[in-house]
Regions:
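Hydrophobic alpha-helical
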Residues: 1-37
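Sec-exported extracytoplasmic/periplasmic mature domains
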Residues: 13-17, 40, 44, 61-68
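Short, charged, surface-exposed secondary-structure boundary motifs
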Residues: 35-39, 56-59
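Short beta-strand elements at the ligand-binding edges of bilobed clamshell
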Residues: 41-53
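Hinge/cleft segment of the Venus flytrap/periplasmic-binding protein
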Residues: 51-103
Length: 103
């Protein structure tokens, strides 16, 4: 099962499953705390995640730039945030800590 966002992934994780051995493989999006736990215990294979802090930073910076008095700026409409695959092998790797959501 591929879940297209964190909310859908968490809804799937909350579903009652009849037999854990027959549960379909799950791949999610965004490494929320609940998903990190699911990856650790094998409920979720892994997820594609972006860097939440960097995304927020870029958003605030764009807002500041557009409100600067008498300054002409060009704001990129789409900014690639270099997504990463997060699974049990890299979940605790410090290089991937920027991709993990904390709540």
């Amino acid at each position: 099962v591929f879940c297209t966002n964190a909310d859908i992934t968490e809804m799937y994780l909350n579903l009652e499953k009849s037999d854990e051995h027959d549960a379909p493989a799950l791949v999610g999006v965004d490494a929320t705390t609940k998903q990190q736990e699911a990856i650790r215990n094998g409920e979720e294979i892994g997820c594609v995640s972006q860097q939440p802090y960097a995304m927020g930073y870029q958003t605030i910076w764009a807002a500041v730039e557009t409100t600067a008095p008498k300054k002409s700026v060009v704001i990129e409409k789409n900014v690639l945030s270099n997504p990463a695959w997060i699974d049990a092998d890299c979940l605790d790797d410090p290089d991937y800590s920027g991709y993990l959501y904390t709540e």
